[in-house]
């Protein structure tokens, strides 16, 4: 609990009961008018920096249902990555990228006094705007647009008239990942490397893309769009705090000139297109772990979101799409939390899943009542996904090499002069780190990391990054550092999968696996006669494209062009293929794939001798 000095700014608190009013969240049937009284909360012994516009910690007192409450707030220092940037496009299509100053921002997390749970997500940019929980009920607060007045409206979420009474749902109908056995996390015995992975802090560097329809929905007002996104991510960050996953906004792109993909109301088409665009375009411009498309279009039916399951850190699939379906940012943030949960391997809740709320985050049908909580099933599935897949990208702390501002203790980033950083006094769960000083506690050798366990360096020789395949090489802790050594892989061209393939960049690419990835289980590679189509260069049958022209395959290269697959059911077409007008390489045989005895497909889609290919 914060030790604070209270400095009272005397503002009267006059509750007023209203019947109906139109606010930003919509038409509200019952509300109170309050005048929050600010109690400036200074950390004991700390001095507020004169150049800092927004304080690190604040308290406000006002009445709810005629009874006084105190709202404790602390700045969410982990909201933005240090290298946060924004991109939009001029009317003539020029890319405009900026690095706005976000260190002294106005977004806070907090709680109501005498309630230990962090359930408040508040913007203090112009008055208090956001939501909090009190005695299990969700309340919203926002300033009233009255000149020269400190008046705010406080109201229960249930008193907001529903924009659409129809049920809403997620588009995921089947999982792409499922644990081999329904083992409970508590029954699982971890290996040393799994234990090290689970003990390490998890960071998701999030990129959000706003499509052109949403840009026009907000009448091209960049400030309004930024505010909307910041409020959503502040709530998203709050929701994932309970899972010990820190979400930092690293990038915002606004398609102000036009969409970079064909955003359709068909969710699976849009999701696949967005994933392909992320892999070929966005990842080359901005390093991040996960991207979410926020769109103003209405998806088909009652679907408002869609995401790949168990796909975190996969270039083409660590994505989700979310419809901006409500005036209340809390509901949109809950939907984004749901789709991000799918990316983290969490499936929809079954009937037996429970949480301490009327609705849980991963319910298949999304409730009109917002939820801050994951069910017991969700927590177990996340745990199982992390220990079985160990997605590596979320172990990387936000870059410190790009930091140009002074070190900030409490933002989860270990910067110059710090030995550890576990967040604020409220958030810190690290027994090795002093949250007030960002220094290790006496006797601690380390704070966190895959090679740190119980504040001590892990024994030298402990596996910290197991081999992901026979084309990978395991790495071991040194016993003197928290870091796992640089990732190394087997030499390209080494035979793998019982000589069915050759190693390429740490993988063993073979055609049958690529067919299954494109078409699902029950598929295999088509006969050679199908691949001969690639000699024509017609339609989608080619080896590569240059200057918008199809380049046909030479006879010896046909198995390096379009990939043809067939289903085991003999009644289906024998030469099935996939393509995308937005990603010319989609559906082609992967580089490094075996195309004959002792031969592999090179980057120019030629079938060459494996001994000279690399």
UniProtKB/Swiss-Prot annotation:
Chain residues that bind Zn(2+): 338, 342, 348
Record flagged with keyword Nuclease: no
Domain Disintegrin stretches: 406-492
Gene Ontology biological process terms from the UniProt entry: proteolysis; venom-mediated perturbation of biological process; venom-mediated perturbation of blood coagulation
GO molecular function per UniProt: metalloendopeptidase activity; metallopeptidase activity; toxin activity; zinc ion binding
Keyword annotations of the record: Calcium, Cell adhesion impairing toxin, Disulfide bond, Fibrinogenolytic toxin, Glycoprotein, Hemostasis impairing toxin, Hydrolase, Metal-binding, Metalloprotease, Protease, Pyrrolidone carboxylic acid, Secreted, Signal, Toxin, Zinc, Zymogen
Location of the protein in the cell: Secreted
Domain Peptidase M12B: 202-398
Post-translation changes: N-glycosylated.
UniProt EC number: 3.4.24.-
Positions of modified residues (Pyrrolidone carboxylic acid (Glu)): 193
Classification via InterPro entries: ADAM_Cys-rich (IPR006586), Disintegrin_CS (IPR018358), Disintegrin_dom (IPR001762), Disintegrin_dom_sf (IPR036436), MetalloPept_cat_dom_sf (IPR024079), Peptidase_M12B (IPR001590), Peptidase_M12B_N (IPR002870), Reprolysin_adamalysin (IPR034027)
Residue numbers binding Ca(2+) 2: 472, 475, 487
Tissue: Expressed by the venom gland (at protein level). Expressed by the venom gland.
Glycosylation sites: 221, 534
Domain of life: Eukaryota
Main location: secreted
UniProt similarity note: Belongs to the venom metalloproteinase (M12B) family. P-III subfamily. P-IIIa sub-subfamily.
Assembly with partners or alone: Monomer.
This protein's name: Zinc metalloproteinase-disintegrin-like protein F1
Organism encoding this protein: Vipera ammodytes ammodytes
């Amino acid at each position: 609990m914060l030790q604070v000095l209270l400095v009272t700014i005397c503002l009267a608190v006059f509750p007023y009961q209203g019947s109906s009013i139109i606010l930003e969240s919509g038409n509200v049937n019952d509300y109170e008018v309050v005048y929050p009284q600010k109690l400036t909360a200074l950390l004991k012994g700390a001095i507020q920096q004169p150049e800092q516009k927004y304080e690190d910690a604040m308290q406000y007192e006002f009445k709810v249902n005629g009874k006084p409450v105190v709202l404790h707030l602390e700045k969410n220092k982990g909201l933005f990555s240090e290298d946060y940037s924004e991109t939009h496009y001029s009317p003539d299509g020029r890319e405009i990228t900026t690095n706005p100053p976000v260190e002294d921002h106005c977004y806070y997390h907090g709680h109501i006094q005498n309630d230990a749970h962090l359930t408040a997500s508040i913007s203090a940019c112009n008055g208090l705007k956001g939501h909090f929980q009190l005695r299990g009920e969700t309340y919203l607060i926002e300033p009233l647009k009255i000149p020269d007045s400190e008046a705010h409206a406080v109201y229960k979420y249930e008193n907001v008239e529903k924009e659409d009474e129809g049920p809403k749902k997620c588009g995921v109908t089947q999982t792409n990942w499922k644990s081999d056995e329904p083992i409970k996390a508590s029954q699982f015995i971890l290996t040393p490397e799994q234990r090290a992975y689970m003990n390490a802090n998890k960071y998701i560097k999030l990129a959000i893309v706003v499509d052109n329809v949403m840009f026009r929905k907000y009448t091209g007002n960049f400030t309004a769009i930024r505010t909307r996104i910041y409020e959503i991510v502040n709530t998203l960050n709050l929701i994932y705090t309970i899972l010990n996953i820190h979400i930092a906004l690293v990038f915002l792109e606004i398609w102000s000139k036009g969409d970079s993909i064909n955003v359709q109301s068909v969710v699976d088409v849009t999701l696949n297109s967005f994933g392909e665009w992320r892999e070929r375009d966005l990842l080359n411009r901005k390093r991040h772990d996960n991207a979410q498309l926020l769109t103003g279009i209405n998806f088909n039916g009652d679907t408002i979101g869609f995401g790949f399951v168990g796909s975190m850190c996969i270039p083409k699939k660590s994505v989700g799409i979310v419809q901006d379906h409500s005036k209340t940012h809390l509901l949109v943030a809950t939907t984004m939390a749901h789709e991000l949960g799918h990316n983290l391997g969490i499936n929809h809740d079954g009937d037996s899943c429970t949480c301490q709320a009327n609705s849980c985050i991963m319910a298949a049908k999304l409730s009109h009542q917002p939820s801050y909580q994951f069910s017991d099933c969700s927590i177990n599935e996340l745990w199982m996904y992390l220990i079985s897949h160990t997605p590596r990208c979320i172990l990387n702390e936000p870059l410190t090499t790009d930091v140009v501002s002074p070190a900030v203790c409490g933002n989860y980033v270990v910067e110059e002069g710090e030995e550890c950083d576990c967040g604020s006094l409220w958030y810190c769960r690290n027994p090795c780190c002093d949250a007030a000083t960002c220094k290790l506690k006496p006797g601690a050798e380390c704070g966190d990391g895959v090679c740190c366990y119980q504040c001590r360096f892990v024994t030298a020789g402990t596996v910290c990054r197991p081999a992901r395949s026979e084309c990978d090489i395991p790495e071991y802790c040194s016993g003197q550092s928290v870091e796992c050594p640089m990732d190394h892989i087997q030499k390209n061209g080494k035979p793998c999968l019982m000589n069915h393939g050759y190693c390429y960049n740490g993988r063993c690419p073979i055609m049958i696996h690529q067919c299954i990835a494109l078409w699902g289980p029950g598929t295999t590679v088509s006969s050679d006669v199908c691949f001969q189509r690639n000699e024509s260069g017609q339609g989608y049958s080619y080896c590569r494209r240059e200057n918008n022209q199809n380049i046909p395959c030479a006879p010896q290269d046909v198995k390096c062009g379009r990939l043809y697959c067939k289903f085991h059911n003999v009644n289906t077409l024998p030469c099935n293929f996939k393509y995308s007008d937005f990603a010319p390489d989609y559906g082609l045989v992967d580089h490094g794939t075996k195309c004959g005895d002792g031969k592999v497909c090179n980057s120019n889609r030629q079938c060459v001798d494996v001994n000279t290919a690399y």
